Amino acid sequence: MTDNPSVDDVGMPVHGLFIGSRNGDAWSAEERDAVFTETSRLFKSFTIMDALGCYMGRPVPTLMVRVGSNDVHRIRELAHVLGRLTKQKEVGLETMGRFHSIRI
């Protein structure tokens, strides 16, 4: 049970967005803050984590944004917003264990 009446006890899907570093360097505090700011414009609750991804056999510093939401359209909107912000060609999206590449 929760004290927040807007939260469904059944839960909601958790979506993960994966944003790889374009130049292979670690994400700067400024870049991370910009991702936080843009994400907070669309969602009130989320988690941003640093991760190490792998692309074509090479390690890639990756930001992972996790959001619980039933609004898939808004999640895809966030993928496009963050993709443009970070100059990506694609952003990875995982929903309920299924991975998709979102072209920007």
Task: Name every feature range the model reports, one short phrase each.
Residues 2-104:
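Positively charged, small/polar-rich N-terminal and surface patches that mediate targeting and assembly
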